[in-house]
Amino acid sequence: MAKYRKTFTSNGKVVSTANQVIDFTQDSFPYNNCNVQYLHIQTFATALRIKLNDESAIHWIDADEDFLIDDINIDKFIILDSGVEYYYTAMSVE
């Protein structure tokens, strides 16, 4: 079982803005320049498009879906759409 050392969350359902960057490399003693290995995004009534890290690939998350990535390091993700309700949780593994 993995141990998580830092957790990030949207603190409930939020509404996106276009090109919104969620960056996990913020300075936050004692875990500076953190990246996450677990990312869960839940959408509600509208689909959502995101990019991970600095990749050009676009990931499409359908409306009312749960999207989970737990096998790569993620420094940040970028939300491409505005006005979409979503929730996220991300964790870094120890």
Where in this protein do the model-derived segments appear?
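C-terminal interaction-tip segments
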Residues: 1-26, 81-94
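Beta-rich globular "head" domains
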Residues: 18-51
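Tight coil/turn sites that cap or link beta-strands
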Residues: 18-19, 25, 55-56, 61-66, ...
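Noncatalytic modules at the cell exterior or secretory-pathway interfaces
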Residues: 35-39, 71-86
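Short, surface-exposed beta-strand/strand-loop-strand elements in extracellular ectodomains
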Residues: 42-60, 88-91
